[in-house]
Design a protein with these regions (language model features):
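Non-catalytic accessory segments flanking P-loop/AAA+ NTPase cores
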Residues: 1-505
Length: 505
């Protein structure tokens, strides 16, 4: 899904149209999400006084598994352009228990925001970094030909050409340089300009001029792509970051562990990097990352990311029904209720310490989703229910929905399997009757066994195409027609037998 450059102009109707290209049905959920997303943009246009008073209306999506809750979140993340994080409520534990505390979701969202902002800044600096990377590649290809230090000697570069000498590997047809002749040509000119210059200085200047000429020849070859497969030695630095007490004090246990690991790496010298032999093509990628990382202002990245997270961040909490408690609390239920109470201040608005600074969660939009097949939304603690004022029920899927899911969305299941087999030279022709039959089987199995929604189609498609996928090399250049009879032959007896369908489909 393409990102919209001017997202503030994306109306709720346009957002729904974008989602329609990937998700079948569930119009109520799409409309609720579209309005919530649009309200984020509307709020940013308000005067500062009233802007702080407008709180996001958090959404609770209720629907059976496989009906599109997670897919809506996944597509929304690619569409909104704002810091977006999808988490599962079940991976968090109450404060005091072993596991991740709920505040880590804010730290993770902040990390997502920083990565997005850094990627944008690097893209803006990419053109400027090309010349820097080119010079560093030339320093590695021609050690000693780079910038001169105060003593007149070339600055030391890490790595360099292979031990046999890089010049010996160059094709004579590509470049021919007579260093002695160049030195002779340069020397008389230098003598005319500086008649009193010492002999050693003249020789050094002549050698420097020859080096520069050689460097420019190699620069031209580098730009023409003639050196991409040459091997060079270089020192690759791991981006382990600089540990500091701010990270330890303001982060989580994971941050503390990473900081301590960074300190240990610095003490044992592993932070200095590792020498590797790579091609020029690989070296360019490595150097580009290093140069861009050094050019980016990381303080500005953190500030801009924090602003985006606080003003337009979105967190999608999946499986929230799994932390709901039915009846009286006991055993593990106590911990589940504790997680709910820990989530409360985050959703309502509080300050969370992260390694990038303190983040205010007041205006972060939370979208929660759950099947609620065992528990009900009313089993959540009342305080948490009140933090999700908008409730949207998603519909169960039936055969007509399955038929549309198989064929209508962009990059649908049928399109995916057809494209995969085309790489083997096999053309797949799936008839409408076959699609109808697979849709009926999916509905029947969902009704007789566990209802897993559209995920049942993946299982059925794999079962129908199992033999073709295995024997694809034997059918190269052929067109295989999948009709209703073929589908029945592969699923014969399975859909009617509940025991078989429970374990196979």
């Amino acid at each position: 899904m393409e990102k919209i450059d001017n997202r503030t102009e994306l109306t709720p109707k346009q957002i729904v149209e974008k989602l329609d290209g990937y998700i079948i049905g569930q119009d109520k959920a799409k409309r609720a999400v579209a309005v919530a997303l649009r309200n984020r943009f509307r709020r940013l246009k308000l005067p500062e006084g009233i802007r702080d008073e407008v709180a996001p209306k958090n959404i609770l999506m209720i629907g059976p598994t496989g009906c599109g809750k997670t897919e809506i979140a996944r597509r929304l993340a690619k569409l909104c352009g704002a810091p977006f994080l999808k988490v599962e409520a079940t991976k968090y534990t109450e404060v005091g228990y072993v596991g991740r505390d709920v505040e880590s979701m804010i730290r993770d969202l902040m990390a997502v925001g920083c990565n997005d902002v850094k990627a944008e800044m690097e893209e803006q600096l990419r053109e400027k970094s090309v010349s820097v990377v080119e010079d560093r590649l030339l320093d590695l290809l021609l050690p000693g030909s780079g910038k001169k230090g105060k003593d007149g000697k070339s600055e030391k570069t890490e790595g360099g050409a292979k031990p046999l000498g890089f010049l010996s590997q160059v094709n004579p047809n590509e470049i021919t340089i007579d260093l002695h002749k160049m030195a002779e040509d340069i020397q008389p000119q230098d003598e005319a300009e500086n008649p009193g210059q010492p002999e050693n200085q003249k020789a050094d200047d002549s050698a420097a001029e020859a080096d520069n000429h050689t460097r420019e020849k190699f620069r031209q070859m580098l730009r023409e792509g003639k050196l991409e497969d040459r091997e060079i030695d270089m020192v690759v630095h791991r981006n382990i970051g600089m540990p500091n007490m701010e990270i330890i004090a303001g982060g989580s246990l994971d941050d503390l562990q990473n900081s301590m690991q960074g300190i240990l790496n610095m003490m044992n010298g592993s932070g200095r990097g590792k020498k590797r032999t790579v091609t020029v093509r690989e070296a360019r990628k490595i150097l580009t990352e290093e140069v861009l990382d050094s050019m980016v202002d990381h303080d500005k990245v953190a500030d801009e990311a924090r602003r985006r997270v606080e003003q337009s961040g979105i967190i999608f909490i999946d499986e929230i029904d799994k932390i709901a408690v039915r009846g009286e609390s006991h055993g593990q239920d106590v911990s589940r209720e504790g997680v709910q109470r820990d989530i409360l201040p985050i959703v309502e608005g509080s300050n969370v310490n992260t390694k990038f600074g303190v983040v205010d969660t007041t205006h972060i939009l939370f979208i929660a989703a759950g099947a609620f097949s065992v528990a009900a939304p009313s089993d959540l603690i009342p305080e948490l229910q009140g933090r999700f004022p908008l409730r949207v029920e998603l519909d169960s899927l039936h055969k007509d929905d399955f038929k549309r899911i198989l064929s209508e969305p962009k990059n649908s299941l049928i399109m995916q399997y057809t494209a995969l087999l085309e790489t083997e030279g096999v053309k797949l022709d799936i008839t409408d009757e076959a699609i109808d039959r697979m849709s009926v089987v999916a509905e029947e199995v969902n009704a007789s066994a566990e209802n897993i929604g559209a995920r049942r189609l993946h299982t059925i498609m794999e079962k129908v195409l199992a033999d073709i996928n295995f024997e694809a090399d034997e059918h190269k250049g052929e067109t295989i027609v999948i009709d209703a009879a073929y589908v029945d032959s592969k699923l014969e007896g399975i859909s009617q037998n509940q025991d078989l369908s429970r374990y196979i489909l």
